[in-house]
Amino acid sequence: MSNFSIPSAHTFLSRFRMPRTLLALVLIFLFASGIANSHAASASVQVFGATGAALPDVAVYAEPLSGPALPKSQKTVDIEQKGRKFLPPMTVIQVGTNISFPNNDTVRHHVYSLSPAKVFDLKLYAGEPENPVNFDKPGTVVIGCNIHDQMVAYIHVVPTPYFARTDTSGKARLDGLAPGKYRLKTWHANLPPAAPIPEQQITLTASDAVTNFTVNMNAR
């Protein structure tokens, strides 16, 4: 076996001949990032439904009660059509996110929504649609196929980057939150139409510890 030695930091950096000013800026950025990460907080959320059972596919999100306005997302995510279903059946995204709707079926689909939060219409197509759809307002968007009525999915658009979807055990975790006060909200497709979105105020401290919260929803 040949000997292998790890070069020193000085040797490694000297190979790139990075200007000292730029190197200093990089080191400052890394140092600041380390501070930010070391003070990030996390919230672990357990959601139970009306029957007392753990509730999957719940949108869980935290809205800061103070601080600067949060930038909109510039991400693109997929909701595919396969087996004449939308997958996943529930998606939670931040305002500003683009969604592409690839059709991986052997038949064409006509994807649309009439929801106030986003009205759009993708005529019959196969494969990749020409352009993704931008979701620029918060709210719940119900999507369907104009050809196959059984195809329904939900998109919950939230005004914060701190969100997750509960797993099969009804659990979700929000990471990277700055210490402070938040409004913790939950949404599920089976909430009664007139029911308010469940919410509670929470406080997260500056530590690496995970704070646990339990939410009970009137949904099945």
Feature annotation, model-predicted:
Residues P7, G34-A36, S100:
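Intrinsic disorder/low-complexity signature
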Residues H39-R220:
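Extracytoplasmic copper-binding redox domains, predominantly the cupredoxin/blue-copper superfamily
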